[in-house]
Amino acid sequence: MDQADGTAMIPPLVEQLRFTRSEWLRALRGVGEADALRRIEPMNSIGWIVGHLAWQEQRYFLTRAQRVTPVPLLDEVAANGGPPTTPSLRDMRAAWREVTGAADSWLGSLPARALSEMLPPPGATQTVGDAIQRVTYHYWFHIGEILAIRQLLGHPHRPEFVGDLETRAPYRAT
């Protein structure tokens, strides 16, 4: 569906992913480098979580969808099933910004019909829409993990509930 100015309307799934990313950043607000390096087993370090979500977005939206891998280091330090690592929060946030910036350009250009198209291999057989949903829900899983780690570390002023969803990413059918 196009907007009045002729530009494509961003699919609701993409809006929800963008809102979820903003909530994830809110969960990270106030986390310092030293705390992000700590690993309270069996949980991951916060630095790893940041890299891991960048890794997943890169894998789905850049490597598979566009055949580019701008931050190959993520495959080494934050891939699913890899050994536990404790990468620098600063480095992983920089990688996350690079990956999500590139992914956003692609996601923002997707017409709604593209969400039903298959995401190219390698990886699970899934549509682009399935991949966006999986990434979105994966963020929420790790938001909970980050907040649990922060609680164990005694961090005050943690987010306690979902932010302003109805204003920033309200429901719409198309």
Question: What residue ranges belong to the model's regions?
Answer:
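Short, contiguous alpha-helical
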Residues: 2, 14-21, 25, 33-79, ...
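Surface-exposed helix-capping loop/turn segments at secondary-structure junctions
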Residues: 30-37, 105-116, 152-156
